[in-house]
Each structure stands twice: as structure tokens, then as C-alpha cells.
Amino acid sequence: MKRIAVLTSGGDAPGMNAAIRAVVRQAISEGMEVYGINEGYAGMVAGDIHELSARSVGDIISRGGTFLCSARYPEFAKLEGQLKGIEQLKKHGIEGVVVIGGDGSYHGAMRLTEHGFPAIGVPGTIDNDIVGTDFTIGFDTAVTTAMDAIDKIRDTSSSHRRTFVVEVMGRHAGDIALWAGIASGADVIVVPEEDFNINDVVDRIKAGYDKGKKHSIIVLAEGVMPAAQFAEELKAAGDTSDLRVTELGHIQRGGSPTARDRVLASRMGAHAVKLLKEGRGGLAVGIRNEQMVENPILGTAEEGALFSLTTDGKIVVNNPHKADLELADLNRNLSI
């Protein structure tokens, strides 16, 4: 394989630039040419493709976001969109593609491989909800950003003896809430993976004030419900504290990536190139117990594949990701 391309797709995540840099420089070290595709699959279909050099990716390792830009492009799920994208790849002489993004991006990589263009998925999302890997690119930075924000909220919360409900991102996963909540000493963490009783939350907050606490922090994963609605339910259940709501929002997707995300992205990007060099495709890279691994994107659960097809052609997730609820138990023991 002599010429490959790299793209970022879906929501951006800190560390994507570090992954792009690793793909480009590892490929050049392997004697390959590298092309960048702007704005994900939309750019592929539009032919927005250009050659990258080692200098093209200089000084981007510390930058958040993705300098190739990203976009959601549902049209690529259709055969017509895939064929248009493949036409552009052929036009530029591209033989393989590295796709950095979430599970939707992986589906596109799988389709490219089926059409004869080996593609490797690299997990880039702050949500940490991709199967086949312990951690995704961007998660550590998002947790650090959320922790820093909660630390600041704690300052004002304690000054006014208030209860704060802090909503963090994560889509349907509670990883950011759990990690940021524990790191910031939250009193209560509420995640989608665990049932909760609103009356128990009220009792826990009241018990804290009765023990002499001056404030309370509740970290809420966005996949549970909006923070404003959660606050209303707290009041309806009898909470009498001075309650405030903060939604951290997209600040969690920005900012300079942490050292861990930079190193993780560099390792994953380089590993993806090595797989393409071997002519392999239809795989997603990941990290398990600090070691690089790869899994088939599509297949059976027994084969270790991330996704499988039902008899009616629908894509389903094998062994869906769930946040580590041992962390939830840990927080309940520590937040007394």
C-alpha cells in the first residue's frame, strides 16, 4: 500500500489532531503518501482531498478539535453516497483510509472495506462509549475539563451554602460523570447505567447538610435527563436547599488535550497505519490493559467483532459499553 488517507468524522474530541499527526508521520516513515480528507465523509464525497506532509501536521499535537474539520454525513449510510466517496478515492489513487471518530464513523469504515478499500477505525469521542477499547481519544481531556469546572463551582457553592446540579456530557454513557464526579468529590453522581430514586438523592443531600456540610454537588450525566428537569424533580420530592443548575456543555469537547490523550492518540494513529501497511481493513484499534489491540468492526460477538448484522440487515452492538459501576459504589463510600 503506497497511498492512504485520513479523516475525522462525527463530534470532535481533543486529541484528534495528535492522531492525525501520528497517522501522517508514521505513514511517511513507512514510505507511504498521505492525504487528508476535510469534513469527514462529506468531504470524501465532495472530493475535498489534499496531500499532507510531515510539516502539514507540525505544531498541531497541542491543539484541540481537528484541523481537518469534521461533519456528520448520514448520506454515507446509503449505497449512493458510498459509491460517490469511493469514486473520489480512486480518482486520488488512495488505497486505504484511517477513520477517526465514533461508532457511526466505524460503520462508514466498514462499508469502505466491503467495497475493497481497507479502512481502520480509531476511537475518537469524549463519551468513552466505544466497545473494544478501555479508553477513547478525548475522554481524559473532557474529564479534566469537567473536573476543573466542578472545582470552580464548588468554590461558589460553598460560599453561599448552595446545592449545584452539574450536567456533564457523555451521550448515553456515564463515564464522564463518574470520573469527573469522583475526581471533584461530588456528593451524588447520577448515571444512565444505574437506576436511581429521587427521594434517595434528596435524603442524601439533606443528610449531608445535617452533618455540617456547607454545600452539595450533584454530577448528572446528560443521558439521564436535563439538569433543569432533574432540579424540578428534586424540589417536587422535598428538597429545601438553595438549588442551582449548571450545564457544562460543549466546553468539554474543546481545549488542549491532556498528556494521556496525546500519547493515546499517537499510539492509536500509528497502530492504524501499521495495520493498513499489512493490507488489513475492517478493523478498529483500541487499548486494553495499556496494550494496542484491534477488533473486527463487523462480525460475531464470538469473533470479538464490535458490531453484527441481524437477519433483517440492522447493525447492532455486540457487548454494548457500560460505565464501571464499581466507581459509583466507590463514590457513595467516599462522599459521606
Swiss-Prot record:
Which pathway is this protein engaged in?
Carbohydrate degradation; glycolysis; D-glyceraldehyde 3-phosphate and glycerone phosphate from D-glucose: step 3/4
Entry binding sites for Mg(2+): 103
Could you tell me the superkingdom of the organism this chain comes from?
A: Bacteria
The EC number of this protein is 2.7.1.11
Q: Which residues bind ATP?
A: 11, 72-73, 102-105
Instruction: List the GO cellular component terms.
Output: 6-phosphofructokinase complex
Q: What InterPro entries does the database record attribute to this sequence?
A: ATP_PFK (IPR022953), ATP_PFK_prok-type (IPR012003), PFKA_ATP_prok (IPR012828), Phosphofructokinase_CS (IPR015912), Phosphofructokinase_dom (IPR000023), PKF_sf (IPR035966)
Biological role: Catalyzes the phosphorylation of D-fructose 6-phosphate to fructose 1,6-bisphosphate by ATP, the first committing step of glycolysis.
Subunit field text: Homotetramer.
What family name appears in the similarity comment?
A: Belongs to the phosphofructokinase type A (PFKA) family. ATP-dependent PFK group I subfamily. Prokaryotic clade 'B1' sub-subfamily.
Protein name, please?
ATP-dependent 6-phosphofructokinase
What organism does this protein naturally occur in?
A: Streptococcus suis (strain 05ZYH33)
Organism taxonomic ancestry:
Bacteria, Bacillati, Bacillota, Bacilli, Lactobacillales
Per UniProt, what is the name of the gene that codes for the protein in this document?
Answer: pfkA
